[in-house]
Amino acid sequence: MNAPSTRDDRDDRAGSDVVTSGTGDTGELDRRSFLTRAGAVAALGAAGWSGRQLLHGPEPAQAAAAAAGTVDPADTDPLNLLKRMLSYDTSNYGEGGNTRPHAEMLKGVWDRAGVATEIVETPKPDNVHLIARIKGTTSAKPLLVLGHSDVVPVERENWRVDPWAGRVRKGQIYGRGALDMKGMNSAAVSALLRHIDEGGTFERDIIVLTDCDEEAGSYGSRWLAEQHWDKVDAGMVLTEGGWFLAQKNGTTPMLITATRQDKVYFNLDLYAEGTATHSSKPRPDAAIVRLSRAVDELSGWLAPVHLTPVTRDYFAALAKATDDDRFAKAIRMLLHARSQPARERAARVMVARSSYPWLHSALLRTTTAYVIEDAGYKENVIPSTAHVRINCRAVPGGQRPRHFLAAVRDKVAGRHIKVKLARPAGTSEAEYLDQLDKTWATKPADLDTPLFRALRKAAAATYPRAEFASALFEAGTSLHPWRERGIPGYGVYPYVIDNAQLVAMHGNNERIYVDALRRGTDFMYRMFDRFRA
C-alpha cells in the first residue's frame, strides 16, 4: 500500500487547484485493491492474504514473501519514489550522462522487493542501464517496460525551484524529468511493487529496463539490443508517449491515449557564406544576414497537412471527447475536408481552438525547430560563414523526409544557402534518405495485442468519463530496436497534464500534478493486473 503523505504533500495538495470529478470518476482503487488496504481485512492481511486472495483464494508461491513485508511502503508511493529519482542529476549533454547513482538507488528498491536486477555497464564510465526481471509463471514472451533515466540539461536561472529537489508546490511536483520520464518510471515501478506486495504473480516475465542515452549518446537501447539482446527480448513493449489530455479547465480527464507510432526524426543544416571583412564596414552579403533572411523565410512556412489512419482515429476520438463544441466542429471540418486547401484552412482553425495547440499542430505535419546556431568569433570581424541546425519530425505515412528536404531547398533557392541532411559518418545522403524512408514506412503497432487491450481496459476503469484512443507520438522514444524486429511497442505518460505542463517538457519548471501521478499509478496498476497469473 502507499506510504502516508509527507507534510509537504498534504499541505500542497490541500491547496491544489486540481479538479476531482464526481461519483464514478474519482479514480479510486478497484474492489480488490480496496480490500487489500481496508482495515476490515487487517487480520487476514497479517496471515498473508492479499485482496486478490480474499476473492480468489491464496497464491502460495508468493504469499509468504508478501506476508513477510518485503516491499518497503515508501517504494509503493509514487510521489516518494519520484522525489528520489528527481534528486539524481542524470543530465545528458549529448554523449550520455552519469546514470549510475540513480541506477543503484533503483536497484536497491527492486532488491528490497526480492526482484532480480542487473546493472549493465557501457563503454562510457558511470553511464549504465538497469534491468529488473519479475519472473512469471509461464514461458510466454515477456512484457518489457522501457523507461529512460537520462534527462536533458536545465537552464537553472530560469527555474522557480531547484530542479533536483523534487519540490511540491500548489499540488505539482517540479523537477527535471518529472514529466519526461521519471514520473512514468515511478508510476510503473510503484504499481508493480504494489502487486508484489500483495503476493501477486504474473503470467509472463515482466522486464523493467531503465535505459541510458535516450536523449542522446552512443550506448542507448540500440547498443544494448545489439550487445545483450537475450536480456531485453520481449513480446511487447511499453514506454513513454501517449498523452492524457484534460478538458479546457486543465484537470478533468478528456482523452487518454496510447501511442503506437513515433514521428520520423532527422536534422537539416543550413550554411550561409558571405564576405568576411572589418565590422566597421558592414555589407548586405554578410553570412549572418543571409542566414537570418533564410531562417525568417522558413519560419513563416508550414509544411503541408497530412492525415494518416492513425491521426484520423486520434482526431475523431478527440472530437468526441472534448466538451468544447467549437473545437469539436473544427476537428470534424478537418476530417471531412476533401481538398488540400480545405484541409489547411480547417487545420488552422482547429489548432487555434485547441487547448494544446503546439501538440495538435505537430501531429498534422513535418515540423521544424531551430535548435543550434553558430556564427562569428570576434566582435570586430564579420564572419564568412554562419550555420543553423533544424530539427525535423516527419509524420509516418505523410510527407517523406526526402520530399521535405527538396521543399526546403526550393524555399531558399537563390539565397546563397546550402541545405545539408545531417547523417551518420560514412553514410551518403542517398543512403540516409533510404534509411529514413524505411523508418517512415514502418507500420504502427497492432491494436489487437494483450498490452493494448490492457491499456484500454485500465483507461476505462481509471478514467471512466474520458475517451481512449491510439495516437501518433510527436517526438521519439527508445523503441527502435524492438520495432525493427516486429515487436509491438506503445507509449503512455500516465498522468493528466495541462498545456503549460506540456510546454515545460524539456523546458523550464517541468512539473506534473501530484494527484494526477497517483491516479496514473492506479492506471498502471490496473494495466499490470491484466497480466496477473
List each language-model region with its residue ranges.
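N-terminal secretory signal peptides
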Residues: 1-30, 57
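C-terminal region of N-terminal signal peptides and the immediate post-cleavage residues
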Residues: 50-66
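Metal-dependent amide/peptide-bond hydrolase catalytic core
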Residues: 64-67, 243-519, 525, 529-532
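Solvent-exposed loop/turn segments at secondary-structure junctions
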Residues: 92-93, 125, 138, 149-153, ...
